[in-house]
Structures are given as structure tokens and as C-alpha cells.
């Protein structure tokens, strides 16, 4: 997801302290693994074992990108008389498309005596945008509220087991006392995407590493999340001393004074650039191409390369530009399975009065489905300022602030189109610009009995064929991109106008 030609992209990373930067639109950062629940398929540690081993902690860590400090983490875990309290503050300065922005994240909560989750609060602030999620566990339900402060939506998730939470996945792995070369799956809950995912953690060989002027014997653990690898080094007491992730991100335990020292904000590497993929040829006027063939390497089996305008065989991806039938022959009869994509959804509030009111200003009741779609795409293109932002994309907030990168553009477009009676989804992958392919997000909408791509950053219906779809769906589905970040290679074989 990028911005380019004036466009930007930004990715969201949600990370429990460095576990990983996953880039989705200039894509940028937002905390990926936040709350971890030891779930049904996890061999959980008994409450007695956990209580005996847990102690109060006050830890500071620096966050680095290729050796340059870009932020810090302050984590407090307090053992109280009858329960526990955790608090984690993250501060980062992130460079996307040459723009450095500050990101502040707070995660805190209370734990019951048996270490099960009682309540939590997650708050993210960056420039114009703010996101909050808070809630508690009631019997077999996680009940929580998400969105803009003052106008939050209630959500519930059924839990098959009583959830537990630890400061990080590695704390849980340490408490499980994994033997060397043994793996275990842990389930995590991400409050910004309403999803529960599985992470595989493996105990590696012990290593001696330098930390705070000392050489310390550590236990090494590596986590695999959807193909992306992150490693951590823990002390014999279980303190996380160091973490490394993709795109040159790492964290290391330091003193409070060291953590609070200044951050280098000049010359930071642009993650949008380093996560992009080189092209072997120059593509001129991509909007005029009818067909493109690209050899694709370094991908897994979780991606959505086949279907619609894309055909993938023997490592070669063929993308053919769609063509709408003449308006007179355009029948927008919507099948039942497609009608699912007319529904309002978290962050895509198509039934909200503000969204409906904006749609009524954009379209006319006499417009055809195609006319409605083109008017909405054009309105988003002209009225949403193209600027990289650090946020949890939310259609209502984008409509209010009228600024954002490709994620913000595409999520607002989904809400507007659905409100206008046009089924719509998000797609994510790569798009060509100035000799490289950048991560990007756009839309797909149902017109004339077929799914048609649309890009409100470029004002295109259909989107040009250099848009390479890797996933289709919301931010949960976009997590599948983590496994190919830094691995995918592209070779353009043919271009046909």
C-alpha cells in the first residue's frame, strides 16, 4: 500500500514489542500482537505454577531500525495483594515516504489471582488519529468497546476457555518450560482486528549475548507467525532482554536513562522503501496495459493469487484488465453470497447515519450502479488528502479527518459503496511505481455480475494491471502478507497494450 504520484502508503504493525512489523499501506505501524490469550489448543501452565514464578517487573527497552534508535518501550508488571496489573507504554518515531511521525501506544489491564484477564485498555495516538479499545471478560465472553473515544461500538467474542494474558508471547513460552528444539502453539487476540490467531514458538539453543555491558547466558525462542520470523533472548529469570524482527527491527533491554535519551530523527530509513520490491524492467503508462505477465517467487500458500482477473500457473502470474459491459447492458443483480459484502462491519460502518448522509451528497437516486461507483471513487480521490498516517483505519474517522494513506482510502470506499448498495471489499498487495513495486491497498466492487477493481488513490476503475492482488479481505486477511514481506521477488515477463 503506497502512496505515489502523490501517494503514500503505510503499514500497520501491531506488535507486542517488536514482534513484527507487518506492512500494509505505506503500510505502517500499529501494534500487532497486543493481548495474548493462552487458548484452547495451548497447553497452558497451571495457575499455581504461574503465580509462583511471576514477580513484579519494571523494564525499559530501546527500539531500533537497522541499528538506529526509533523509540522505546516501558513495561511494568505489578504483583498486588490479590491480583496483578500490567502497563506498557510504547513511543516510536516512524519514517514513511520521507515523513517522520510520532506514535504513542498504551496497553494496560488487570489480572485475576489465577492470572486470567479481568480487564484491559488499549490506546493509540498519532497526529490526527486516535484509537481506543477497552473491555473485560465476563464468564465465557470477551466484551469490549472499540473505535473513536465517545462513539465506540460494542463487540463480543465467545471464548471456549477462560483466557489468560501474559506480557508477551515469550513470557508464556518461558512459563511453559519448553525443552530445546520443542515447539508449541499459542493463540493471541488482536483488539484492533477482532481476530484470534495462532503463533508457533520454538525453543532454540542457549546463547550468550552482550546486554547492558555484561555477557549473559540466555534462552532463545523463535516465533513463526504466518511465515514471518521473530526471535527473543530471555534471561534465566524469564526477562526479555532482546528481540529481532523483520525489516531490520529489533529491541534491547537498557537502563531507564538510556531509554529516555534522544531519538535520531534524521536519516531514518524509510520502511516504505526498504519493504518495496525491485522491478527488472521499466513500465511506462501502466494504466494503458491490457495484460501483464510476472514471474513470482518467494510466496507461501496463504495468498490469493488466483481468481478474477488474475491467473497463476507455474510461478507465472497473468493479470488481465477487466472491461465493464455497456451501461445499458449492466445488470447489477446481486447473488446471495455476494450480498454479504453489503453488510456494515467494524471499521466499515456502512449503516452509520454520517456515512449514509455523505453517500446521499455524492450520488443521485437515478444513478446506475456504475455511475454511483464512479462518483464515489472520484469523490474519495478528490476529497481525502493523500498523506501517510499511523492509525487503525476506521471509515468514520477518515470521513471526519479527510486524510490518510491507501488503507484509509480503501476502508472509507468500502463503507460508502456498501451504503450505496454496491458490494465492496478491500484488496492488498503490490503496485508498480517508478521502477519498484510498493505495498498498497485498493478495492474490488461488484458491477455487472463481476468483481471489478478500483483504486481511489489513483482514481481508477478498473485499477491498472500492475496492481498485484495477494490478499482480499479486511485487516485480518492482510496479516497473511507478513510471511512474504522481504521474501517475494518479481520478474516482469510480458507487457501488452
Question: What do the predicted segments below correspond to?
Answer:
Residues 1-9:
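Short, Lys/Arg-enriched N-terminal segments with co-localized hydrophobic residues
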Residues 9-139, 150, 175-330, 334, ...:
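Acidic, serine/threonine-rich low-complexity disordered tracts
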Residues 148-167, 376:
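Acidic/charged, solvent-exposed loop-and-adjacent secondary-structure segments enriched in E/D, K/R, S/T
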Residues 166, 330-404, 412, 474-476, ...:
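Secondary-structure boundary elements
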Residues 218, 229, 237-240, 291, ...:
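Active-site lining segments that contact anionic ligands and/or coordinate catalytic metals
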Residues 252-265, 271-276, 333-335, 419-422, ...:
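Active-site rim recognition segments
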Residues 376, 402-430, 443:
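Cysteine-centered nucleophilic/redox motifs
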Residues 383-386, 406, 431-434, 451, ...:
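Solvent-exposed loop/turn segments at secondary-structure junctions
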Amino acid at each position: 500500500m503506497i502512496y505515489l504520484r502523490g501517494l503514500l502508503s503505510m503499514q500497520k504493525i501491531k506488535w507486542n514489542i517488536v514482534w513484527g512489523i507487518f506492512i500494509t499501506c505505506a503500510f505502517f505501524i500499529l501494534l500487532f500482537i497486543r493481548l495474548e490469550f493462552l487458548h484452547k489448543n495451548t497447553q497452558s501452565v497451571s495457575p499455581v505454577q504461574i503465580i509462583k514464578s511471576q514477580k513484579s517487573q519494571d523494564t525499559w527497552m530501546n527500539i531500533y531500525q537497522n541499528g538506529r534508535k526509533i523509540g522505546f518501550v516501558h513495561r511494568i508488571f505489578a504483583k498486588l495483594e490479590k491480583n496483578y496489573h500490567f502497563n506498557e507504554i510504547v513511543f516510536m518515531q516512524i519514517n514513511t515516504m520521507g515523513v517522520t511521525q510520532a506514535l504513542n501506544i498504551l496497553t494496560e489491564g488487570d489480572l485475576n489471582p489465577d492470572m486470567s484477564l479481568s480487564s484491559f485498555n488499549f490506546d493509540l495516538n498519532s497526529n490526527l488519529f486516535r484509537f481506543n479499545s477497552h473491555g473485560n471478560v465476563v464468564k465465557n465472553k470477551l466484551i469490549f468497546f472499540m473505535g473513536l473515544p465517545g462513539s465506540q461500538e460494542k463487540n463480543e467474542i465467545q471464548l471456549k476457555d477462560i483466557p489468560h494474558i501474559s506480557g508477551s508471547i515469550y513470557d508464556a513460552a518461558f512459563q511453559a518450560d519448553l525443552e530445546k528444539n520443542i515447539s508449541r502453539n499459542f493463540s493471541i487476540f488482536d483488539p484492533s482486528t477482532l481476530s484470534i490467531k495462532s503463533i508457533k514458538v520454538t525453543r532454540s539453543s542457549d546463547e550468550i549475548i552482550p546486554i547492558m555491558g555484561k555477557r549473559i547466558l540466555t534462552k532463545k525462542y523463535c516465533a513463526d507467525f504466518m511465515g514471518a520470523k521473530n526471535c527473543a533472548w530471555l534471561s534465566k529469570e524469564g526477562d526479555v532482554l532482546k528481540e529481532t524482527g523483520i525489516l531490520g527491527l529489533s529491541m534491547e533491554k537498557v537502563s531507564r536513562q538510556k531509554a529516555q535519551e534522544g531519538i535520531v530523527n534524521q536519516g531514518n530509513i524509510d520502511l516504505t522503501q526498504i519493504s518495496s520490491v525491485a522491478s527488472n524492467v521499466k513500465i511506462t503508462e501502466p494504466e494503458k496495459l491490457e495484460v501483464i505477465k510476472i514471474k513470482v517467487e518467494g510466496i507461501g500458500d496463504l495468498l490469493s493469487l488466483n481468481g478474477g482477473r488474475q491467473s497463476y500457473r507455474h510461478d507465472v502470474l497473468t493479470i488481465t484488465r477487466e472491461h465493464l459491459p455497456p451501461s445499458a447492458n449492466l445488470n447489477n443483480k446481486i447473488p446471495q453470497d455476494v450480498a454479504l459484502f453489503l453488510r456494515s462491519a467494524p471499521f466499515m460502518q456502512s449503516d452509520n447515519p454520517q456515512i449514509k448522509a455523505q453517500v446521499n451528497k455524492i450520488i443521485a437516486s437515478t444513478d446506475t450502479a456504475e455511475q454511483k461507483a464512479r462518483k464515489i471513487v472520484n469523490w474519495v480521490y478528490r476529497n481525502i488528502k493523500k498523506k501517510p498516517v499511523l492509525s487503525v483505519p476506521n471509515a468514520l474517522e477518515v470521513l471526519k479527518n479527510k486524510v490518510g494513506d491507501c488503507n484509509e482510502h480503501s476502508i472509507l470506499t468500502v463503507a460508502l459503496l456498501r451504503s450505496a448498495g454496491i458490494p465492496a471489499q478491500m484488496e492488498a498487495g503490490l503496485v508498480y511505481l517508478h521502477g519498484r513495486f510498493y505495498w498498497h491497498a485498493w478495492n474490488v466492487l461488484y458491477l455487472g455480475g463481476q468483481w471489478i477493481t478500483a483504486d481511489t488513490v489513483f482514481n481508477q476503475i478498473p485499477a491498472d494491471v500492475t496492481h498485484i492482488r495477494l490478499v482480499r479481505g479486511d485487516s485480518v486477511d492482510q496479516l497473511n502478507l507478513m510471511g512474504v514481506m522481504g521474501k517475494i521477488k518479481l520478474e516482469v515477463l510480458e507487457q501488452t497494450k
